[in-house]
Every structure is written in C-alpha cells, then in structure tokens.
Amino acid sequence: LCIWTATTMKATVATAIGLIPFLLTFIFICIKRPTILLCITFIINYIIMGINRYYPIPIPITNIFDLLFGIMLTLIILKQVYTDDDNRKNAMNAYTFVLLGWLLYCIINAGNGITGELYPEAWLRILRPWAIYPLLTCFILSIHCNRYSFLHYFLILWGIFTLLAATKGYWQKNKGFDSTELAWLWAYGARTHFIHSGIRYFSFFTDAAIFGSTMGLSCTTFFLSALYSKNRYLKLFYFVVSMAGFYGLLIAGTRAAIAIPIAGLGVFLFLSKNWKIGMLSFLLLVGGVGMLKYTKIGEDNRLIRRMRTVFDSNDQSLLVRFENQKALKAYMSEMPFGIGMGVQNGVISPQNKYYFVSICPADSSLVD
C-alpha cells in the first residue's frame, strides 16, 4: 500500500497513508499503557514554552493540552471497556477530593461579577490549567501509575529535563543569550530580568520566575528521593539532579521560589515516619534559613546575597510588594474572593474601578 501510494499520489497524501500503520500501532500501545501518553504530555509541557519563543505556535497552547488530555481519557475508557483492569477505586483518594473541591470553587467563581461584568472566556482560559488539568492528571496517575517502577522511570525522565534546563541556564550565564532571547528580553523581559542585583536567567522557560519555581520543586523532590532510594546509582543520579535544581534556583534569582524547598521540607517533616531522615531534613531546613537570615556567610556571592534578601524586611523590592498589598487592602473588604479568574491586564477597561487589581503583580495579590 505504501509503495503504491508513493508512486501514484502526492507526497503528502502518501506520507499520511504510510503513517497509518504506525499511528494504529502507537494507539494500541497507548491503550495498553496510557502512561506513555502522560509522559509525552509531560515532555511537551516542559519544552513547549521554549519552542514557542523561537517558533510561535499559531494556536493557544491550552488547546494542545485539551487534545492530549482528551485522547488520554478516551484511551483509558477504551481500556476499561475492553479489559478487566479496573483500578477506578484508586482515584478515590484525599488528593482527588481536594482537587474536586478546588474545581467546585473555581466553577462557582465563574459568577464573580464584582467588576460589573462577567468574563467567561478569561475564566475558561484559566480554569483548564488551574483546575481541570491537575484533576485529570491526578485521576490518570491514581489509576495507571500505581507501581514504584513507573515512579522511578518518571523521576529519571523528569531528572533528564531538569539537567537540560539547568544546563541551558548555565549556558546563558556563562555564554550569554542568543539573538531570539535578547529580542524577547528587550521587547518584554528587560525590566524584570535586568535588575540592580544582576541578571535573572530563565533557561528555556517563559521567564525566570517559572524557571526558578520549577528548579526549586526539582531540587526538593530529587533530594528527598535520593534519601530514600536504595539503588546507589539512582541515589547518585537523584542527588546530582537535586544540586542542578538548586543551581537553577540560584541563577533564576527568584526569591519567592525559595519558599518551595522550605515548604517541601516542612511538609516532609510533618509526614515523615523516619526520624533519622526527618532530623536531617530539619537540620538542613533550620540551618539554611538561619544562615541566610542571621549570618553573612557567602555574602560575596551575588546569588546567595540575592537569596538572603528574602529574609531582609528592609529590602527595597520587598517593600514594593508591601506597598502593593497596602493598596490592595482598600479593595479587599469589597471583593474577598477577588475580581474573577483570568481578569488580568487587558481584560477590563482602565476606567473600571478594579483596574489596579487586574494589573497588580500576582505575587503581591494575596493579602492577609
């Protein structure tokens, strides 16, 4: 069939027909192991931001993930119908119910008309990555990713991309930005990435904040995984990835991301049943925070010096955030649930009473 189409039809048609057997084989494999498509989704999610900077994607990125999650759910349903593998009860766990509660809150938030108007398109655009995707991911993981072997394979995959991200950040720091990155910086990111304390590097992510937060999560996850892994090669790999994540966190210059390893170790201490590992984590947590807050160790290093500003109540950048919070407090009595999901700069008119709230930096919008 492939030979006949190649000799009698246009190249594009022949290629499409020739790929049908491979596509059917791939679908069959994914029905047997839906986790393969989940890993592909993870890979795309990790690199699509960088791809979009060099080759702008003509459709909304959320549409791509709508398609991927839709295919995954379809394959899972087919597997449930045609096999005896029924693990749906595994999805009934605490995390699923927490996400269901969060989804319900987000759905209710669709009726938030505090600005005088509803914005269903903006709400739906934010609802998917904030609530629907996490719930679907939890559902898929609970049903089909319930073996330690998958966890190790997934951590290896995650570790490889963490190393790639940290390496790209290292390249930016030591070799400089390429022409596309410089064009983006001068057009959009210079104000937030060229600051008085130095340059904030962003690897192949959308910005330094996302890069730093991702590296902080990787640092915490792989450090804890290294503590528990019994395979010495995996233990070494996890530890190297953790250090790479910590390096990425440093060069990103995102102080808010430091909260991720602090919170991660704190939660681990609460959940840990191994007192030796728990004590080690406690000493690292207290020692790290104490070093940054009460000492001048590493003050000559620009990266450590910037991290230390997180705990400096007189830091100018932190004071700006406090000023934003003071301005927002005037609105909070009127809008305790905010102005609506997705109501950001460009959505509401500058003449709207709540325009300031829509343009206020997101990391300053949570006011006690």
Task: Label each PLM-derived region with a short phrase.
Residues 1-81, 108-112:
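N-terminal signal-anchor transmembrane segment
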Residues 22-27, 103, 107-111, 135-137, ...:
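Alpha-helical transmembrane segments of multi-pass inner-membrane proteins
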Residues 167, 173-176, 252, 269-312, ...:
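A membrane-periplasm/extracellular boundary helix in multi-pass inner-membrane enzymes
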